[in-house]
């Protein structure tokens, strides 16, 4: 009988321990919070970082077709500010770049939106985001210091690497270049995607 009591006591203990563990989890607010956190994290791991379909549609407009190469006067460039035209173009050091894929930076609400549709050379070379630093006519940049010219050259390199070069900024009275449809930069694979 003593062996039966010990066996019965052992069975009762294991039943109490398993029932006690569940009871402890569901009766303690801290344990419920931790259990909920574990379930949430497990859900996020299994589900992954999939954006909701409605969020991605609102943030990103459909990509625009590639702009054919052409040259722009400062007045023609002004139209491509992301407001009048969905495409955003900027001129840097006499080169015009399509920065539409960088809309978050260069769009109307972006931190560099003042440069959209403009020659941004002087503003980038002098680190000035004021509209007063930008000129409405062609800016020959002859008054930039050597340090500012080097800064501008660095910006030019970055934009050449990252964005599509669509043409050049024309001086007053300068004739536009006639580009062939086949003329493209040599190595498109080196251009970085956003």
Swiss-Prot record:
The Swiss-Prot or TrEMBL note on domains reads: The cytochrome b5 heme-binding domain lacks the conserved iron-binding His residues at positions 106 and 130.
Name the chain's protein. Membrane-associated progesterone receptor component 1
Disordered: region residues: 50-70, 174-194
Mind listing the UniProt keywords for this protein, alphabetically? Endoplasmic reticulum, Iron, Lipid-binding, Membrane, Metal-binding, Microsome, Mitochondrion, Mitochondrion outer membrane, Phosphoprotein, Receptor, Secreted, Steroid-binding, Transmembrane, Transmembrane helix
For the Cytochrome b5 heme-binding domain, which residue ranges apply? 71-170
Q: Phosphoserine-modified residues are where?
A: 54, 56, 180
One of its GO biological process terms is: positive regulation of lipoprotein transport
| Other remarks on this protein | Non-classical progesterone receptors involved in extranuclear signaling are classified in 2 groups: the class II progestin and adipoQ receptor (PAQR) family (also called mPRs) (PAQR5, PAQR6, PAQR7, PAQR8 and PAQR9) and the b5-like heme/steroid-binding protein family (also called MAPRs) (PGRMC1, PGRMC2, NENF and CYB5D2).
What is this organism's lineage? Answer: Eukaryota, Metazoa, Chordata, Craniata, Vertebrata
Q: What does this protein do?
A: Component of a progesterone-binding protein complex. Binds progesterone. Has many reported cellular functions (heme homeostasis, interaction with CYPs). Required for the maintenance of uterine histoarchitecture and normal female reproductive lifespan. Intracellular heme chaperone. Regulates heme synthesis via interactions with FECH and acts as a heme donor for at least some hemoproteins. Forms a ternary complex with TMEM97 receptor and low density lipid receptor/LDLR, which increases LDLR-mediated LDL lipoprotein internalization.
Q: Which GO terms describe its cellular component?
A: chromosome, centromeric region; endomembrane system; endoplasmic reticulum; extracellular exosome; germinal vesicle; meiotic spindle midzone; membrane; midbody
Q: Outline the subunit composition.
A: Homodimer. Forms stable homodimer through hydrophobic heme-heme stacking interactions. Interacts with FECH; the interaction results in decreased FECH activity. Interacts with EGFR, CYP1A1 and CYP3A4; the interactions require PGRMC1 homodimerization. Interacts with TMEM97 and LDLR; the interaction increases LDL internalization.
Q: Where in the cell is it found?
A: Microsome membrane; Smooth endoplasmic reticulum membrane; Mitochondrion outer membrane; Secreted
Species per Swiss-Prot/TrEMBL record? Bos taurus (Bovine)
User: Which Gene3D superfamilies does the UniProt entry name for this protein?
Assistant: Cytochrome b5-like heme/steroid binding domain
């Amino acid at each position: 009988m003593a062996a039966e009591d010990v066996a019965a006591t052992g069975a009762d203990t294991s039943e109490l321990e398993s029932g006690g563990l569940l009871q402890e989890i569901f009766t303690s607010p801290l344990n419920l919070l931790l259990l909920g956190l574990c379930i949430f994290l497990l859900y996020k791991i299994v589900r992954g970082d999939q954006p909701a379909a409605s969020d991605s549609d609102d943030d990103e407009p459909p990509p625009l077709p590639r702009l054919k190469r052409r040259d722009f006067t400062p007045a023609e460039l002004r139209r491509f500010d992301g407001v009048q035209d969905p495409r955003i173009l900027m001129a840097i050091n006499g080169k015009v770049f399509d920065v539409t894929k960088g809309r978050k930076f260069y769009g109307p609400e972006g931190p560099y939106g003042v440069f959209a549709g403009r020659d941004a050379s002087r503003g980038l070379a002098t680190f000035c985001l004021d509209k007063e630093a930008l000129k409405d006519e062609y800016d020959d940049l002859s008054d930039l210091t050597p340090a500012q010219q080097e800064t501008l050259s660095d910006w030019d390199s970055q934009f050449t690497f990252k964005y599509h070069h669509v043409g050049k900024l024309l001086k007053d009275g300068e004739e536009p270049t006639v580009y062939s449809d086949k003329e493209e930069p040599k190595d498109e694979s080196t251009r970085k995607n956003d």
